């Protein structure tokens, strides 16, 4: 990164990760009885996503209920905080290294910055969507148990 970039741009990914982690932690603290989320449909969320044409909506439509949504968000939070299992990473590296074409060092260096920018933009977008999901789940839980105006 260049030194002339504003501080907000330098920490954009860090800020997005913190927003997501904060939203999931808030969700985790609010949802005192996660089993109440079982069999609660995502219909309200689906209607909202159809109106906004959200790029991640197809993932949420595949989920059966709010409990699976809750579990998924907590799992993603744990992966961000603690990392993924190393044995899976090593196995994937072995599988992909055999199929990767051989590149020269110059080609690799030129592509690295573009590749990093592509993935950072994607990661930032995904983190924003996940933060929104965690906040929506928290609000929906409050509605379901009748405390929708509390804590706001």
UniProtKB/Swiss-Prot annotation:
Signal peptide: none
Keywords for this protein: Cytoplasm, Cytoskeleton, Microtubule, Nucleus
Main location: nucleus
Tissue: Expressed for a short period in the cells that will produce the enveloping layer (EVL).
Residue stretches of biased makeup (Basic and acidic residues): 87-105
Biological process per Gene Ontology, one example term: regulation of lipid biosynthetic process
Localization: Nucleus; Cytoplasm; Cytoplasm, Cytoskeleton
Top-level taxon of the source organism: Eukaryota
Region annotation (Disordered) ranges: 87-109
Recorded GO CC terms: cytosol; microtubule; nucleus
Family, per entry: Belongs to the SPOT14 family.
Function in brief: Involved in stabilization of microtubules. May play a role in the regulation of lipogenesis.
Protein's recorded name: Mid1-interacting protein 1A
Biological source species: Danio rerio
Gene responsible for this protein: mid1ip1a
């Amino acid at each position: 990164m260049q030194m002339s970039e504003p501080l907000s741009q330098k920490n954009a990914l860090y800020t997005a990760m913190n927003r997501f982690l904060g939203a999931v932690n808030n969700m985790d603290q609010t949802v005192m009885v996660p089993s109440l989320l079982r069999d609660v449909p995502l219909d309200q969320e689906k209607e909202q996503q159809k109106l906004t044409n959200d790029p991640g909506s197809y993932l949420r439509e595949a989920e059966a209920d709010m409990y699976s949504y809750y579990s998924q968000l907590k799992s993603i939070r744990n992966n961000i905080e603690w990392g993924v299992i190393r044995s899976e990473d090593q196995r994937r590296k072995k599988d992909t290294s055999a199929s990767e074409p051989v590149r020269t060092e110059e080609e690799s260096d030129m592509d690295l910055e573009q590749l990093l920018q592509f993935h950072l933009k994607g990661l930032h977008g995904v983190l924003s969507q996940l933060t929104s999901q965690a906040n929506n789940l928290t609000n929906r839980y409050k509605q379901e148990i009748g405390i929708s105006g509390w804590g706001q």
